[in-house]
Amino acid sequence: TITDARKQVVDFSEGYYNADLLIAVKSTDNSIVKFSDLTGKKVGLKQGTAAASFMKSKYKANYIEFPNIDNAYLDLQAGNLDAVVHDSPNVLYYVKTAGNGKVKSTGETDSILPQQYGFAMQKNSSLTPKVNQALQALRADGTYDKIYVKWFAKQPK
């Protein structure tokens, strides 16, 4: 994640992914559409993350923290949780792979805790402009969109 604090230590490429938080719910659950719908629900979070801290301070739910987010997804599928909240790329990948047909993502319209991912490189690296050129070329010829859809089953934002 590109942050001002990290920029003091390393150089970043241009952002290659715009992330935020998403909600994973069972495919049959239509009661949770946005983050405010989590009130009073049993919600899984990954322990020690910015997402967990933010959610606990902003939304009143019954939170259960897991050292590994995969265990939260398993509890969701088993019916022990109403939802799991985590970073969008992870949620989208899980929905497309192990959760396919059993779990769906929601909360896209809320744009909670937006952040941008970039490649970190040594300060003043000669690679930074080359990586940026490669990212620009991938976007220009449509390759970036194809890769994104392959892994996340959605068009990039």
Predicted feature locations:
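Hydrophobic residues within well-ordered alpha-helices
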Residues: 38, 76-77, 119, 131
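Solvent-exposed coil/turn segments that connect beta secondary-structure elements
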Residues: 1-3, 17, 26-29, 48-49, ...
